[in-house]
């Protein structure tokens, strides 16, 4: 009877450990997926034409004149 009790306790500990590991793995997977945004959401994170900016990456056109987003980047010889 003692051996059966010990066996049941060991089985319970193993099952709870496995369940805990699965839960943490699933939570990490959800966190990883939630960091990604669809392209439509990423588009609106950039500034449209004539929005305030300080660097090119803040503008949808990828062209900032240090004050406002430009409609499009101009050639360097302008």
Curated annotation (Swiss-Prot):
Disulfide bonds join 46-60, 53-64, 59-69. Residues 1-19 form the signal peptide. InterPro entries: Conotoxin. Keywords: Disulfide bond, Ion channel impairing toxin, Knottin, Neurotoxin, Secreted, Signal, Toxin. GO terms for cellular component: extracellular region. It comes from the Eukaryota. GO terms for molecular function: ion channel inhibitor activity; toxin activity. It is found in: Secreted. The presence of a 'disulfide through disulfide knot' structurally defines this protein as a knottin. The cysteine framework is VI/VII (C-C-CC-C-C). Belongs to the conotoxin O2 superfamily. This is Gamma-conotoxin-like TxMEKL-053. It comes from Conus textile (Cloth-of-gold cone).
